């Protein structure tokens, strides 16, 4: 068995890596839930079902760690997988739930590998274990706070900018549509009212198109216009999250520095 040595000094590099990777993971969960609910307008239950892919993948990853005895290799592989998954979320081409599944699988497996390896390293050969376990928990909690604080200002700025760009693009869609002029004017006023009511958010424009015209031709034109506008808004919302996901991926990659610098054979 491993001989424990009485020391109050925590494993600085392992805990630093834990903080950085926890910041990246917090960014992943926080941003993905916001994207699904506020951007793509999924229900909270629907969003919860979608993000459940991540913990399920983590269960798979917990089985894979037995195949890699080196804690350093597991930590590095896990950090790369987490960052790669975040990079995939940053590059989502459109609002489609299925496209979030592969990046989530990468993040979940990476999470299991890196957290187990770094926690094992931070505690290895140290006593009392309760004290050093507390250091690992503190590092992870600090990372969560840092991650959310890091991505929130970028996300807030970008969602406002993308909202503005999507509105401009949507205006062009309305003007170019085949909807009769009077109906087009009425829709424009309703859409503007919806935008004013939901400043600072990705707007929900569905109510602006109700009630739908009874004339079959106008009905089809309005439905098509609604779909085109919603597509513009969804695309804008998706792109608004890209820089924040990218920052979270970069934070995850930074954890490779303390992992690589650690001199202990266990890492």
Model regions and ranges:
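12-transmembrane solute porter fold
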Residues: 2-167, 241, 246-252
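General structural signal for secondary-structure boundaries
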Residues: 96, 145, 180-184, 264-265
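Aromatic-rich transmembrane-lumenal/periplasmic boundary elements in polytopic membrane proteins
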Residues: 155-208
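Short amphipathic alpha-helical patches
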Residues: 59-63, 162, 166, 173-178, ...
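Transmembrane-helix exit segments and adjacent C-terminal regions of multi-pass membrane proteins
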Residues: 186-267
């Amino acid at each position: 068995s491993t001989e424990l040595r009485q020391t109050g000094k925590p494993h600085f590099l392992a805990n630093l890596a834990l903080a950085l990777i926890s910041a990246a993971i917090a960014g992943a969960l926080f941003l993905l839930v916001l994207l699904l609910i506020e951007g793509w307008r999924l229900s909270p239950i629907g969003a919860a079902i979608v993000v459940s892919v991540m913990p399920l993948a983590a269960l798979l990853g917990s089985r894979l760690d037995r195949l890699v005895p080196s804690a350093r290799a597991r930590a590095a592989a896990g950090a790369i997988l987490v960052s790669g998954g975040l990079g995939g979320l940053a590059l989502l081409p459109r609002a489609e739930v299925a496209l979030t599944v592969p990046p989530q699988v990468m993040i979940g497996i990476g999470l299991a590998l890196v957290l187990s390896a770094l926690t094992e390293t931070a505690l290895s050969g140290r006593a009392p274990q309760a004290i050093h376990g507390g250091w690992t928990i503190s590092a992870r909690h600090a990372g969560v706070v840092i991650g959310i604080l890091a991505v929130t200002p970028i996300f807030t700025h970008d969602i406002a900018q993308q909202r503005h760009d999507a509105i401009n693009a949507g205006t062009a869609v309305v003007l170019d549509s085949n909807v009769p002029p009077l109906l087009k004017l009425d829709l424009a006023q309703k859409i503007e009212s919806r935008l004013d009511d939901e400043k600072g958010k990705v707007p929900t424009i569905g109510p602006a198109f109700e009630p739908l015209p009874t004339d079959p031709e106008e009905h089809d034109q309005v439905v098509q216009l609604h779909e085109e506008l919603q597509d513009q808004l969804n695309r804008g919302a998706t792109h608004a999250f890209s820089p924040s996901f990218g920052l979270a991926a970069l934070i995850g990659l930074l954890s490779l520095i303390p992992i690589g610098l650690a001199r202990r054979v266990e890492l």
